[in-house]
Amino acid sequence: MFVAWRDLRFARGRFVLIGSVVALITLLVGFLAGLTGGLASQNVSAVLDLPGDRLVLQQPSTGQPSFGDSTIGQRAVDGWQAAPGVDDVVPVGIVQGRATAPGAGSGAAGSGAAASGAAVGVALVGLPTGARSTPVTDLAPGRDDQVGLSSGAAADLGVQVGDRITVTGTDYRVAVVGGDAWYSHTPVLAMTPEAWAAADRRLGGDGAPTVLAVSGSPDWDAVGASTGTSAASPLASLTALETFRSEIGSLGLMIVMLFGVSALVVGAFFTVWTMQRAGDVAVLKALGASTGSLVRDALGQALVVLVLGIGVGMLAVVGLGALAGGALPFLLSPVTTVVPAAAMAVLGLAGAAVALRTVTSADPLTALGSNR
């Protein structure tokens, strides 16, 4: 990489420009990936934490299963509980509702909505006690007149353990305040199955569970067909959330398009770059340099620029993401930082490799202008 290092030292302005563009694209891709991850977490974290190997939803006569329309009758519950190979069946009810905190404790840090007595949107989740411990099942209260709140619900309502809140016209005492749990962008409020069924009926439902969290190794398809239900892994079940499908579909398409734009932009920069170095490359080839060594030299130079630009961009993503985490649903994890950075590096090198073809395949004498 003798020529590459000399070029990097003596053409600093060019490489600062290219590196800045790479850093800005990385910042855009990384920040969008973090925002997508944060929005996804606020959409589906409660579903992913349900205590089952697979989640069972009602199979409609037409179309795909949906959390919003699913109701599991007692016959289906009994069918899954009696199926060979089933270890545990946990009926879970999920419905959107609203809660108010008319008597928030003085020690709680109430939000503006809670302080004014306004209703707060929550996801009412009916959970039995004794299920396998997860962040969601740990919220389950022990009595029908109690509720468990996720940290987000407690913060929005401005309450703590021992305070009373009103849900669908009925008062409950807060028995548990747990970790972060979300369903369809609303914080989770856990109730006993009996209390949830009563709340669901007050909201116009029939009180039947929404989903079954099933553990074991039965014949999933056969049991599903006999009970009119559909079983899928928790991750695959996310497609049954309409908000998740539309949200992730649009944001994912934007990320893919940004990756494509990054490859084109980096490739265009390196195309102009290699055209400007055509004379140097031709001299090296005329002196006996192999095509492989020239490719390694150019790609090594591109890799240095990409690593520096991506590194600066990722540092900005981590810093801004940490600052924005309190105001935006932003997720900092290897999936939203390392994966986009690696993809940017691969796509950038691919663009640089395509840009090298016209020079590395040219005849040295022609590149030197011998035809003149």
Regions found by a protein language model. Name each.
Residues S45-Q96, S106-G112:
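Membrane-proximal extracellular/periplasmic loop immediately following the first transmembrane helix
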Residues G38-D49, G63-P65, P234-M257, L315-V339:
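Membrane interfacial helix motifs at helix-loop boundaries and amphipathic/re-entrant anchors
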Residues A33-G37, M254-A286, L294-L299, A355-L356:
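A hydrophobic alpha-helix feature that marks transmembrane segments and, especially
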Residues M1-V29, A40, R372:
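N-terminal Sec/SRP start-transfer signal
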